């Protein structure tokens, strides 16, 4: 089921939250709305769900205009951050409740419950109550309840926020598997870049009620259009160096950093610039050598993370395979890989 938000706007009183948004989610696609708190991603999801009525524009499911339809008439499945399971009901009763409300015969409900329980792999938990379940098991029950009505659209609002790191990893892959097996169109709302990049076909990054870029995870990471997007994706995050164009090279005044810029960056001498350098692009193997001193070193299992204070003051972060010969206080002569550097103007627009 294709979803289209056509010039979608939403205000609360005199406060405009979203204005003239244009967004299309393809049939069978899983799309993430990613951004900081307050950017409008949940407001967008609630409008698709039917909880919020748009102030302007249209919402279409396929060719069907659902803008003015209530939630119950839209055939959507929703999983919220709080799973909202009924504590007095068993797992089977929780999952089957939407069908019971619709008046489906008990035998048919049981058949559907068994089918969906097999899909989300909780067939052995049918007689337990929510208090007897782990966080991951409760999440699976909530997902099963959302899917049992065979919705056209699945909406996920921060569904993994209450899980620990191990369970989040497990449920990321499980939700993605289920979405692919069912072929359902899904929208995920999250502020977690790892969730968005690992679970979704495309990501729409939002800022202050606007979509600033929409692309596949790989395209978004490797070709950010703004410094905001570049800074939002990546862990450890990208480092921004501020300088000016001097004789064709990016230069940080009072430092030894000079980096020739590609011919595609056509700006005037003296223009203020920002250089974005990801940690994986500052290593001993780069092509623009810069001296510095290690101020922080951390082992992260398979990798080491370093903070290096460059001559002249700026700090660069480096991530490398584990090595034991670098310590805090050491002088290093590493290099920036110019092929992985992003150049932005002083306002954060990619050049």
Protein language model annotation of sequence segments:
Residues 49:
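Helix-to-loop junction immediately C-terminal to a conserved catalytic motif
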Residues 57-65:
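Conserved ABC transporter NBD signature motif
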Residues 34-36:
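The feature captures the beta-strand-to-loop junction immediately N-terminal to the Walker
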Residues 30, 71-228:
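ABC ATPase nucleotide-binding domains
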């Amino acid at each position: 089921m294709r979803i289209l938000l056509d010039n979608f706007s939403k205000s609360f009183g005199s406060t405009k939250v979203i204005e003239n948004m244009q967004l299309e989610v393809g049939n069978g696609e899983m799309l993430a709305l990613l951004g900081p708190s307050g950017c409008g991603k949940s407001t967008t999801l609630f409008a698709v769900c039917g909880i919020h009525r748009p102030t302007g524009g249209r919402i279409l499911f396929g060719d069907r205009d659902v803008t003015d339809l209530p939630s119950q008439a839209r055939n959507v499945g929703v999983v919220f951050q709080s799973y909202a399971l009924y504590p007095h009901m068993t797992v089977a009763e929780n999952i089957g409740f939407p069908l019971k409300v619709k008046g489906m015969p008990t035998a048919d409900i049981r058949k559907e419950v068994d089918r969906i329980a097999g899909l989300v792999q909780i067939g052995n938990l049918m007689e337990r109550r929510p208090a007897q379940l782990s966080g991951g098991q409760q999440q699976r029950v909530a997902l099963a309840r959302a899917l049992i009505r065979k919705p056209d659209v699945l909406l996920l609002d921060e569904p993994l926020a209450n899980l620990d790191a191990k369970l989040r990893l497990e449920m990321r892959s499980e939700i993605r598997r289920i979405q692919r097996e069912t072929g359902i169109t899904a929208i995920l709302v999250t502020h977690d870049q790892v969730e968005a990049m690992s679970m979704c076909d495309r990501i729409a990054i939002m800022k202050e009620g606007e979509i600033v870029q929409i692309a596949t995870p790989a395209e978004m990471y490797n070709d950010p259009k703004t410094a905001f997007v570049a800074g939002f994706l990546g862990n450890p995050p990208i480092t921004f160096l501020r300088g000016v164009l001097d004789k064709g090279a990016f230069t940080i005044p009072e430092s030894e950093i000079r980096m020739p810029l590609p011919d595609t960056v056509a700006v005037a001498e003296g223009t203020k610039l920002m250089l974005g350098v990801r940690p994986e692009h500052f290593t001993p193997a780069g092509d623009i050598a810069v001296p510095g001193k290690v101020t922080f070193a951390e082992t992260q299992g398979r990798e080491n993370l370093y903070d290096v204070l460059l001559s002249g003051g700026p700090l660069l972060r480096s991530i490398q395979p584990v090595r034991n010969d670098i310590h805090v206080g050491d002088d290093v002569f590493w290099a920036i890989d110019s092929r992985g550097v992003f150049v932005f103007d002083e306002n954060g627009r990619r050049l």
